[in-house]
Amino acid sequence: MKELFAALLLGAVGTAWAQTTPAGLWKTIDDETKVEKSLVRITDSGGVLSGKVEKILTDKADAKCVECTDERKGQPVQGMTILRGIKPDAAEKGTWVGGDILDPNNGKIYKVLLKLVDGGKMLDVRGYVGMPMLGRTQTWLRVE
């Protein structure tokens, strides 16, 4: 009985931790059309987050980033790293900043701010130029 309780407790702690970090699999939703676009896996490497397109959910699964201007130019969007260099915001718990996000539709790179909402079930992803108030936000849904 004690072993079962300990296993349940450890499982609950793991679930609680997973909800306090953006690391995991997210379904992206287009902020204009509300269409599900892709699955993005966010990983944490030494406190720095990055995100890779794991699967494209539209009929454009073979899309390439033709407008990209860096090493991603002409590369398949599926498997591409679109989030890079993101770190926890020391001033605001539940927020990550300092990196960038690529919009593979137009090849543009924006500064990015990530914020967990609804107990970690959703992630507000704000891409911007200059200041965060000069940008737009997509809300992604946690898959795992």
What kind of feature is each model-predicted range?
Residues 19-25, 91-100, 121-124:
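Short, hydrophobic/aromatic-rich segments at coil-to-beta transitions
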Residues 14-18:
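Sec/Tat signal peptide C-region and signal peptidase I cleavage site
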Residues 45, 117-119:
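Structural motif
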Residues 4-13:
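Sec-dependent N-terminal signal peptides
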Residues 28-112:
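Central antiparallel beta-sheet cores of small beta-barrel/beta-sandwich binding domains
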Residues 120-122, 128-144:
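Edge beta-strand at a domain terminus
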Residues 112-116, 131:
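Exposed beta-sheet edge/beta-hairpin loop segments within beta-rich domains
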Residues 20-37, 136-144:
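K/E-rich alpha-helical interaction surfaces of small helical-bundle regulatory domains
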